Amino acid sequence: MERSTRAWMSIVVVQAMGSVWMCYAKQNSASHYTSTLPALSRAHALPLALLCILRIVLIFDFRNFSIHIAHILLSILTAIHTMTEVFFYQSMSYGIVTVTEVTLNSFSVVVMLTFLLSPSFKNEQEGKEKRARKVTAKHYMEGEMLTPEDDDELVQAYKKWK
């Protein structure tokens, strides 16, 4: 399950990079905005870029619960932001770019929540807990090992030599 969700994250990262590129490219900057002001596109690119960076961090540190929560919250906020820009403020046009962005963010939230609530995530977390170590070998510097008995033949040979 982890491998599939990581693969999904890499697909969504590529999509987010494309959305950020569209916000900064001159020929396509007004393709999803009703106004042709480049400031609107750049303002929309910031949460997309932050979400893209967070997803890249999540791919490399996939077992971090707090990054998962931050990713889920930022995905929800980005989807809500895009929907309010389209339907409430009507500053963005309803098109393939905005629909894809909202759909992929919403689906990412569902996929990540499914992964976080799955037993495979919980089993890996339980396996990483610290447990008491068993003694596998006795150290020679402990206890009576520093003072050998006098009847030992190595001790007697040392005394004769000295």
Swiss-Prot record:
Main location class: endoplasmic reticulum
Subcellular location, record wording: Endoplasmic reticulum membrane; Cell projection, Dendrite
Transmembrane segments: 7-25, 40-60, 69-89, 96-116
UniProt entry tagged with the keyword Chloroplast: no
Disruption phenotype: Hypersensitive to the acetylcholinesterase inhibitor aldicarb. In a slo-1 (ky399gf) gain of function mutant, restores normal locomotory speed and sensitivity to aldicarb.
GO cellular component: dendrite; endoplasmic reticulum membrane
Distribution of this protein across tissues and organs: Expressed in tissues including muscles, intestine and neurons.
Keywords: Cell projection, Endoplasmic reticulum, Membrane, Transmembrane, Transmembrane helix
Family: Belongs to the ERG28 family.
Function: Promotes the translocation of slo-1 potassium ion channels from the endoplasmic reticulum to its final destination at the plasma membrane, probably by shielding from premature proteasomal degradation in the endoplasmic reticulum. Maintains the levels of slo-1 potassium ion channel at the presynaptic neurons.
Name under which the protein is recorded: Probable ergosterol biosynthetic protein 28 homolog
Organism this protein belongs to: Caenorhabditis elegans
